[in-house]
Amino acid sequence: MRVSCVYATASRWGGPPVASEVRGDAAISTTPDAAPGLAARRRRILFVAEAVTLAHVVRPFALAQSLDPSRYEVHFACDPRYNQLLGPLPFRHHAIHTIPSERFFGNLTQGRFYAMRTLRKYVEADLRVLDEIAPDLVVGDLRISLSVSARLAGIPYIAIANAYWSPYAQRRFPLPDVIWTRLFGVRLVKLLYRLERPLLFALQCMPLNWVRRRHGLSSLGWNLCRIFTDGDHTLYADVPELMPTYDLPANHEYLGPVLWSPAGKPPTWWDSLPTDRPIVYATLGTSGGRNLLQLVLNALAELPVTVIAATAGRSDLKTVPANAFVADYLPGEAAAARSAVVVCNGGSLTTQQALVAGVPVIGVAGNLDQHLNMEAVERAGAGVLLRTERLKSQRVAGAVMQVISRSEYRQAAARLADAFGRDRVGFPQHVENALRLMPENRPRTWLAS
């Protein structure tokens, strides 16, 4: 089974989540997949998503859907801000708090991630959910507090991450869009960043290390990559052909791309698009700048292309050019597959949708995660990286025409599509492997504290 093709179940956009009965013993499921004779024998798996962006919710959501409900009792914990987009949940949902996305992005522009106070509250919330559900295994995506809470609860923990955050990755750290690049320009700040980056990363490691020490756990050191990838097992939602690593330990493995698209009816214009011009799929996702989509649409307005755009519910467009067709959300995999080029924020969710279809990408990258991903795509020859600071329409238009007119971009994207499509160990097997290594009588150390 390949996790590289995980699809959303059929649902209506905006559908309500399935009601669930949450009990501490969690022995009998209230979801339709439950069978009375199977519940006691099924392994209980808890997925925990950090809902600062949609990508970190839909990845564990898609992985949770890949598990056989006759073998696993699945629980899904996340802030409910994206629940309407997910539609009816086929497993139990547990609401936990995630800081507002705007605060998270504001932190990133100031060169920091989470405050110690935030992580302490996260750990407390995690422990309540872990105690309530008593899972056999927990799977987290960017919920770095699980580095503490899962260990205190004695529960095996699988961390989902991108390979460019691996301590074993072969990459450099580019300068992201931060407040200083907007004030002083990229060139000057880049020189200082090369000197100060190790110190900045060390400062960003301090909050989690403080919380770990407070609970009697050892420090993870001053490598930010260890903060984002710490787990009993770490799975990279990437392929080595795009993001190579070296000397991976046995508990770090490639999972392959995890794809997701919102289910539901496409917009009315979906089946009547013009066919005489190349299609450009534009979406800045939930972590792109609110005004960037308008800039992109304006940049493409005079080009001989048809634009299909998804606002992700975040953009208040003042004008929609005549060659553009816009919706809040689109089926991303299908939109990418019918396009000549995809313009996005450079995040892994949309770039993987494009590359799986063999379509090159233009990434308008802002934060470090997006820059790391797009540098890998650009290095592979399958796309172009644009910076968000002082972005001009002419630069966007030039990049689009460059990618459309030069066949080497599509050829490179096709090579990556082949890599993404190769068979590899599927997520259910990784779950089985983690459970097999689980001690029979794991200690619940935090209960005594």
Curated annotation (Swiss-Prot):
Disulfide bond entries: none
Enzyme Commission number(s): 2.4.1.-
InterPro entries hit by this protein: EryCIII-like_C, UDP_glucos_trans
SUPFAM superfamilies according to UniProt: UDP-Glycosyltransferase/glycogen phosphorylase
KW Glycosyltransferase (keyword) present: yes
Keywords: Glycosyltransferase, Transferase
Enzyme class name: transferase
Pfam families per UniProt: EryCIII-like_C
Other noteworthy facts: Was identified as a high-confidence drug target.
Task of the protein: Catalyzes the transfer of the first rhamnosyl residue on p-hydroxybenzoic acid or phenolphthiocerol derivatives to form, after O-methylation at position 2 of the sugar unit, mono-O-methyl-glycosyl-p-hydroxybenzoic acid derivative (p-HBAD I) and 2-O-methyl-rhamnosyl-phenolphthiocerol dimycocerosate (also called mycoside B) during p-hydroxybenzoic acid derivatives (p-HBAD) and glycosylated phenolphthiocerol dimycocerosates (PGL) biosynthesis.
Family: Belongs to the glycosyltransferase 28 family.
Name of the protein: PGL/p-HBAD biosynthesis rhamnosyltransferase
